[in-house]
Amino acid sequence: MAFNFNWSPLMADAGFYTRAQELLTAALNKSPKPPIIVDDIVVTELNLGSNPPELEILEIGDLAEDRFRGIFKMSYAGDAFLTLKTCVQANPLNTYLLTRHPFTSPQPLAAATGLTIPLQITLSDIKLSGFVILVFSKQKGITVVFRNDPLESLKVSSTFDSIPFVRDYLQKEIEGQLRILFMDELPAIIHRLSLRLWGTEYSELETTSAQVTNPSLDGPGLDPLLNPPQDPVDASGNVLSISEIASLSLDSGVEMHSLFSRKNVLRLAALTDSQRTLSLFTPSIREVVFRAWTGSMEQADGPSGLVSPMSPPLSRTHSHIATSSLSLQDAASLASSSHSRPTPPSSGFSGYGLSMGAGRHSKAHARKRKKRVVDLRRRPKSADDMESVSGESAYTTTTSAVSVFSGSTIPEENNDDPVTPPVSPQRTIRRPTLRDRIAARDDAERNSRRGIPAEFGHDLPAVRTSPPIANDMARIIASASNLQRQLQQQQPADSKPLPSLQETAPIRTLRPSPSSTPQYPTEKPNASNNYTSSSSPSARDPQQQQPQQLSRPSSSFIMESAQNGGILEQAWMMKMASEIARRIQDEKMGGEDPTNSSSRGGSGGGFWERPSMRSHTPPPAYRH
């Protein structure tokens, strides 16, 4: 079966090419264009050529007088051509710079920007080959569908053929767009053309839609600005009455155009007032320069010399932080008004916060703020706070109460001046140091220490915290040697030498605390006498000790040595006094019972073997 295609009527019909150009232009601009094309693509020339396409019938599905459906194999290599016109943004130098390293590029300034150039492209030597499904109906027109991509090749001729890069780029982009055109847009274009040829209803519908899109008016168009608005105002914002509007001439177009709606003028005024600020976040108007206006006088000096209607002139406003008006009562007022309820502080916060005002002096309601400071820190004890203890009085503890005092009145700060730091109080509260605390504790222990037992008839004198000097020690040693000589003269011939001090223990000793007892350096024993201090290192070795014979001391010797000695000397004197008292009692008992004395002498100190008279308390030198 063979068919003859009459190609000449299509070429002879001028209206066909016009409609085809419009449809192709709409189809090319429908899809998104590449960024290099900055204008619409317009089809200026279209020619189908003199050579028709070759069709091979593969299948006929339906055949009738008013309808046809079949599958064809189409091939076309004719002289048809298509000319397009658009504008592109071409910059070959910028493309060259993008492909080179920045170190070697010359870095041009003006030539690196894009340049819009008109472009004309001609498509020719089109070769098509593919399978086509053709469906024809007088009611529905012609439908052509390509089962595969029919475009094999084409030739693209443009204004930039002398530039290889641009030529290749355009060839590639246009081929891609034509492939989309054949697969998607060309079937729709052919269908609409067929409807125009055979469908009368479709042609009438298109005519009606064109009239709606471009309405044709019988008379000339009316200017909407010539009709006065409902609330007309003049250029200065003054409302015009009906008589003033009627007095205006209808021929004076300038006067009539100056009538604007009051609502629109207010919106424009609000928009312009929003620019009279130094804020960085206000909306900006293009091609308009604004500056900050501070008052109405400066606004009138502007280029227009007019004040926007219904918009008050801007004035400089000042804000300040109002101080809290809540005052705290001091100690004196609390003491005087203990039976009355304090005033409620709710009304005191009326001026607190951010106060805005048009004037600079908007602090009339601000009140001075008072402060009450409570000192909770422990302060050092003074001599007046301590109570002296005499005799056998018990320990007493003195504590200083927490002091509550009111701070000095702070002068009101001037809000116009720069903020200054608060003034320090006149009285400086110093925290006691470690030395002060140690001295206070020593004073308390010295005042609360127990005295000498009442049987000696004297109280313990004040303790001297300073270490003993050489003169005091020499005096004590000299008086001790005199006592030894007196005791040797008064001692009977049959009495035995008394044991040393290291073998005895005191009846009552003072136990000073380790923290309050100063650590004095030990002194070497004197070679001229046999006396050895119990605090010396030689007292720790029993082999270096020699028996010392002591007798009843006098009260003057005890007081003199106690006044001149330190804490260790006082303990030693108490120890000596207890030893002497015991030995006197032993002598009395020995005088009454000589047999016991001889038996004790034979046993070598049997008196010290009595468990009732033996003290288990170690001497002070061996305590830990």
UniProtKB/Swiss-Prot annotation:
It is found in: Mitochondrion outer membrane. It is a multi-pass membrane protein. Keywords: Lipid transport, Lipid-binding, Membrane, Mitochondrion, Mitochondrion outer membrane, Transmembrane, Transmembrane beta strand, Transport. Its main location: mitochondrion. GO terms for cellular component: ERMES complex. Residues 360-372 have a biased composition (Basic residues). Residues 209-230, 332-395, 407-466, 483-554, 583-624 are annotated as: Disordered. InterPro entries: Mdm34, SMP_LBD. One of its GO terms (biological process) is phospholipid transport. Residues 373-384, 433-448 have a biased composition (Basic and acidic residues). The keyword Transit peptide does not apply. Residues 215-225, 332-341, 525-554 have a biased composition (Low complexity). It comes from the Eukaryota. Residues 1-195 form the SMP-LTD domain. Component of the ERMES/MDM complex, which serves as a molecular tether to connect the endoplasmic reticulum (ER) and mitochondria. Components of this complex are involved in the control of mitochondrial shape and protein biogenesis, and function in nonvesicular lipid trafficking between the ER and mitochondria. MDM34 is required for the interaction of the ER-resident membrane protein MMM1 and the outer mitochondrial membrane-resident beta-barrel protein MDM10. This is Mitochondrial distribution and morphology protein 34. It comes from Ajellomyces dermatitidis (strain ER-3 / ATCC MYA-2586) (Blastomyces dermatitidis). The gene is MDM34.
